[in-house]
Amino acid sequence: MKSMKIAVIPGDGIGVEVMEAALHILNTLDLDLEFIHADAGDACLKRTGTALPEETLEAVGEARATLFGAAGESAADVIVRLRREFDLFANLRPVKSLPGVPCLYPDLDFVIVRENTEDLYVGDEEYTPEGAVAKRIITRTASRRISQFAFQYAQKEGMQKVTAVHKANVLKKTDGIFRDEFYKVASEYPQMEATDYYVDATAMYLITQPQEFQTIVTTNLFGDILSDEAAGLIGGLGLAPSANIGEKNALFEPVHGSAPQIAGKNIANPTAMILTTTLMLKHLNKKQEAQKIEKALQKTLAEGLVTPDLGGKLGTMEMAAEIARHLED
């Protein structure tokens, strides 16, 4: 059986360190994966004159999936371009409490599905004599596609409810289209509960009653904001994985940035990167291996064998070694 090619882009700052930790754990398992290393980010820009070389784009295009560490100031030129270049339309942000990690809600388990290609993030802005104007683009095609993805994901994961988040009471045309397409898709899944909330109410409910949610689907800007808010419920961005999924390609990245202030000190928490690898494995139909890593990570966290940000004394690679040890349990 031919190995699946995985493009590996460590990027900048702690991205390099957490990627090393994740690869150490992946290499402990017999996964039939071939890792193709590629370059991108601030250091790449300084060295080559471009933050995202053509050879990196080629590597991503040829790979079954891409693991990405972190990008610094060049993040928009790297990750945003990769999302657009490969039409990675669905951003998946699981929100799940972890054992041994202090958090606001110890039993959370839901997901935010964010449309990744439209909204204000198309970057169509211009100055006017009085200020500036930005164009918000919401299409029926993209709204239907992301709603379809959300229902399919919820069904696959055994969830019973999908909630659309919008502001159609004010943004009547753009969010009106998003809400309309959501309910058209919902009609194809009569066995599932479909609800919708305004984004401001959702921001409150995430704090007061987050257990009510199972799958949230929303537009680009709202999803960006709400998913970071949700990460705060489970301990912060250092514990949050994400996936960017398209029809043909998929890219997996931790939510945290390059954190240059702690880069090179061997204290970066690898949890988000390791959970990101489990999302990749599930996408590649290696669910058993993903669950094995998740259980090993949970044991390590429960034992307090963690990095300083979680109250422990281990370095990045030391924590990775403990997780790898638990893979053998």
From Swiss-Prot:
Matching InterPro entries: IsoCit/isopropylmalate_DH_CS, IsoPropMal-DH-like_dom, LEU3_arc
Binding site for Mg(2+): 200, 224, 228
GO cellular component, one term: cytoplasm
Compartments it resides in: Cytoplasm
UniProt-annotated site: Important for catalysis, residues: 121, 167
EC numbers, comma separated: 1.1.1.85
Residues binding substrate: 83, 93, 114, 200
Pathway(s): Amino-acid biosynthesis; L-leucine biosynthesis; L-leucine from 3-methyl-2-oxobutanoate: step 3/4
Gene3D superfamilies per the UniProt record, alphabetical: Isopropylmalate Dehydrogenase (3.40.718.10)
Bilayer-crossing regions: none
Note accompanying the cofactor annotation: Binds 1 Mg(2+) or Mn(2+) ion per subunit.
Function: Catalyzes the oxidation of 3-carboxy-2-hydroxy-4-methylpentanoate (3-isopropylmalate) to 3-carboxy-4-methyl-2-oxopentanoate. The product decarboxylates to 4-methyl-2 oxopentanoate.
Assembly information from the UniProt record: Homotetramer.
PANTHER family assigned: DECARBOXYLATING DEHYDROGENASES-ISOCITRATE, ISOPROPYLMALATE, TARTRATE (PTHR11835), ISOCITRATE DEHYDROGENASE [NAD] SUBUNIT ALPHA, MITOCHONDRIAL (PTHR11835:SF34)
Protein name per the record: 3-isopropylmalate dehydrogenase
Organism: Methanothermobacter thermautotrophicus (strain ATCC 29096 / DSM 1053 / JCM 10044 / NBRC 100330 / Delta H)
